[in-house]
Amino acid sequence: MTEDNALTDGGLSDEAQAVIDEIEEKNVDFLRLQFTDILGTVKNVSIPASQAEKAFTEGIYFDGSSIDGFVRIQESDMRLEPDPSTFAVLPWRKKENSAAGRLICDVFNTSTGEPFSGDPRGVLKRAIERAEELGYDVNVAPEPEFFLFEEDEDGRATTVTNDAGGYFDLAPKDLASDVRRDIIYGLESMGFDIEASHHEVAEGQHEINFTYDDALSTADNVATFRSVVRAIAAEHDLHATFMPKPIPRINGSGMHTHISLFKDGENAFHDGDDEFDLSDTAKSFVAGILDHAPAITAVADPTVNSYKRLVPGYEAPVYIAWSDRNRSALIRKPAARTPAASRIEARFPDPSCNPYLAFAALIHAGLDGVEKGLDCPDPVRENIYEFDEAKREEYGIETLPKDLGGAVDALEEDEVIQEALGDHVFEKFVEAKRSEFKDYLVDVSQWELDRYLETF
């Protein structure tokens, strides 16, 4: 992550010049300038590599009114400024002896010259700045899960999984090991540090873990990860999806998100004298996330389908609690081999989220707990799924919203998470999600037809 933009008054920064040199060295002939809209969809404009210097010194202009959640047509001129630290060569070639590169961009208003308040990457930058004002650096490590499905004869996605494997299975049950290997090769060529990959619990479900990094670089990596997984799966005639629950009555896909704060180079979450090896800072950070969890859910689990995953019985968290060992809790404190690895794991985000907005919401919520010195409730070490309502009330355990509408209601009542998003993103996000939930409510599903059409 760079401190400053590469855009200068006619000259190139050293980092931008290094990218120009690498473009020439690696025979890159096209560049994809990438950014993300409010809903988390990656957008891009392609330019010839010969225009790279101009992109760095002048930016690339585009019509922001055509991007969901950006601006109205009468204020539509926007400018992309590439971040040179994000340059990577894409792991596929359209022809021999040439390559395409990728740069992630920040979005600016042309009228004011200021960062665009609706740019999700800018939203996360503001959250990081808030942490830095308190003396903290934020590290994040996500675990995005995905499904691989067969394509039909027309190349369209089906819900037929490409294998019948289960958790940690090997071939022949796991038929996607070669696909995962190719994905890993592609990711590594783009600078990812891969820790492990494996078949997940559900048929056709997979996970590839990459190491933690600062929050902005990690959000960039999530956006890149999803694009690379889809592209390489397609080369194997498979469709990769990060939809949280594509098949009913089996485990859905989550994106467990590990977070830690560092201060002066030391892990601020570690306290070796504590029963759980957690500092007061860590406990207050956990308390902040628990306090704002209903509102965060709207951002971290942003689709109607997300709430088909967030039900008891399929290893997805539903109850607002934390534990040092229990995976039925919303937040878990994983075992750490070293003090530097101390962290907390938020288990409720899913991979359909906009990573920039989800990380920003989690950071703001946690820091709110730290600033207020919130007390963390006692950990719950029992299986919360087995609690009845009376026992949950005894423990003071509340539940996450049961649907997208309830989550958006919670977001509209939570000033901290609204502040995390900023006025523009909050307004446009709520507008989009209200519309999505309304569309869902008026639709008639196949389940309803199967259940009622011949009964009544």
UniProtKB/Swiss-Prot annotation:
Residue intervals of the GS catalytic domain: 120-456
Name of this protein? Glutamine synthetase
Hey, which family's this protein in? Belongs to the glutamine synthetase family.
**Quaternary structure and interacting proteins, as annotated:** Oligomer of 12 subunits arranged in the form of two hexagons. In its feedback-inhibited form, interacts with TnrA in order to block its DNA-binding activity.
- EC assignment: 6.3.1.2
Record site feature (Important for inhibition by glutamine), residues: 72
Record text on cofactor binding = Binds 2 Mg(2+) ions per subunit.
Keyword terms? ATP-binding, Cytoplasm, Ligase, Magnesium, Metal-binding, Nucleotide-binding, Phosphoprotein
Where in the numbering of this chain does the GS beta-grasp domain appear?
26-113
Top EC class of this enzyme? ligase
What does the record list as coiled-coil region(s)? none
